[in-house]
């Protein structure tokens, strides 16, 4: 939990002592008119309310030592917070704990499962959105104080993986990503002409579920090689996992059969199924082999043993699956754990859907490589004074951060189109724009002598606006954690940087009087810390020089 005084909650409690309102009726005013706004339309219209009641609320709020003023304005109460209070809260936290806001660890354990792509090929950019959202949620919840674990469910038992194994046995060659992918694409082309291949795959599925050592051992090697390729690409953009949970382990240790037996199943041609909203949902095939839905139930029961809150990041095409899964967990199995499904829209291309089976894909590796090449051109142009090695390191960090920011800044349910000219724009709404501001702050601090202990409090508008932008950081962090909305952090970062740029243009830091300098240098230090902290939540790595 974040250690800060949430003034929204404080003000909500003042109002709710007399009137029934929603916590959502008290919110940050992002218009710039005031700092906190309260909707009071219902209070004005209620029998025991009216204008006098609203004015009484205004007086109660105005008595708080952090309030500059409070006004009733057309169905709203607008509240202005003292900038001296805001600055003190930020600086005291940073000077005491080294960070703003400080935090203590929650007892609640959280599982964040993301990516979980079949290890049948490289990660395409549509699926990479899953990884970037999931990792950002993990970072946000960890920063908030939850004990969070990153999990990847390795689907090494499904039909696609058995198809990959069958292709390897059929066409041979080394167990390398290139050869396995070529064989995989080949078998799907051949399957369109030769229906007997389908029967081969079904036979191998049965052998696998019966723990045939030859099938199991070879397939584990194949899956491991493909998974290493996915993991190494994700690591390039700062994404790693705490656990790789293998689907086959749940089959071999009996967890899947146990999960099926916990349900009241019916049979049709020897295949077992359950009914959800009048529809049949099959758990096994007629030959007794299990289907993915059954294995996913078992996996969620496994996660529930170690986590009070289970979060799945899923493509929008998995909504029906998730709805059925949630029904099984909550209505049939009475699982008490909190379960959240976060859906996202895919990144689409003009060439249509991306499919590993047919080889028509743009991979995450392709995207990062191209972004790196474009970033390196810009760095070479702007910083010829640096060594080639330094320019390459900067370009790599810019590329990783640019890819992540360009994807995370768009709300998850909305479709996205990646454009390099936007991702690498140093002038607005991009990772380089944010990173350059951090480097600018670092440059000021490099030249700054040690300030006086005391500092003045008379601030011009640009400075006061920056103080407010820093102060509200924990509000955005709290909302992003509770609502699972990492795009809120992306929006906050841009707003914060814009306020710093206004401050930088209007307010001299070095060369002012001692009290003003002492305050402003502390503000710049605090800004640099908060910017770095918030950037890390969505995978932006800051640089001291660009």
From Swiss-Prot:
It is found in: Cytoplasm. NCBIfam families: argS. One of its GO terms (cellular component) is cytoplasm. InterPro entries: Arg-tRNA-ligase, Arg-tRNA-synth_N_sf, ArgRS_core, DALR_anticod-bd, Rossmann-like_a/b/a_fold, tRNAsynth_Ia_anticodon-bd. It comes from Thermoplasma acidophilum (strain ATCC 25905 / DSM 1728 / JCM 9062 / NBRC 15155 / AMRC-C165). Belongs to the class-I aminoacyl-tRNA synthetase family. One of its GO terms (molecular function) is arginine-tRNA ligase activity. One of its GO terms (biological process) is arginyl-tRNA aminoacylation. This is Arginine--tRNA ligase. A motif ('HIGH' region) lies at residues 117-127. HAMAP family: Arg_tRNA_synth (MF_00123). It comes from the Archaea. Its EC number is 6.1.1.19. It catalyses: tRNA(Arg) + L-arginine + ATP = L-arginyl-tRNA(Arg) + AMP + diphosphate. Keywords: Aminoacyl-tRNA synthetase, ATP-binding, Cytoplasm, Ligase, Nucleotide-binding, Protein biosynthesis.
